């Protein structure tokens, strides 16, 4: 079992090394025609992230 653990550890180390040295994408610039429906910032839409409502619901559930 120790041999298997060592092999798995070696594979993880090698994959991590390869991932760290990977080249970036060939075209890292954003596309010229982005999706108008995509919302990259969840805080820009108040309906998407309601922290106060979440806190109130947790407090009301506990109390």
From Swiss-Prot:
The modification Leucine amide is found at residue 62. Disulfide bonds: none annotated. One of its GO terms (cellular component) is extracellular region. Expressed by the venom gland. This is Venom peptide 2b. May be a minor component of E.pomiformis venom. It is found in: Secreted; Target cell membrane. Antimicrobial peptide with strong and moderate activity against the fungi B.cinerea (MIC=5 uM) and C.albicans (MIC=100 uM), the Gram-negative bacterium E.coli (MIC=200 uM) and the Gram-positive bacterium S.aureus (MIC=25 uM). Shows cytolytic activity against insect cell lines. Has potent hemolytic activity against human erythrocytes (EC(50)=64 uM). In vivo, peptide injection in the vicinity of the head and thorax of lepidopteran larvae induces feeding disorder followed by death due to starvation. One of its GO terms (molecular function) is toxin activity. Belongs to the MCD family. Mastoparan subfamily. Residues 23-48 form a propeptide. Coiled coil: none annotated. It comes from the Eukaryota. AXPX repeats lie at residues 22-25, 26-29, 32-35, 38-41, 44-47. One of its GO terms (biological process) is innate immune response. It comes from Eumenes pomiformis (Potter wasp).
């Amino acid at each position: 079992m120790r041999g298997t653990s060592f092999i798995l550890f070696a594979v993880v180390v090698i994959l991590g090394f390869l991932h760290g040295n990977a080249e970036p994408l060939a075209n890292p610039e954003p596309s010229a025609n982005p999706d108008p429906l995509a919302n990259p910032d969840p805080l820009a839409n108040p309906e998407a992230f309601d922290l106060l409502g979440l806190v109130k619901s947790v407090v009301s559930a506990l109390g």
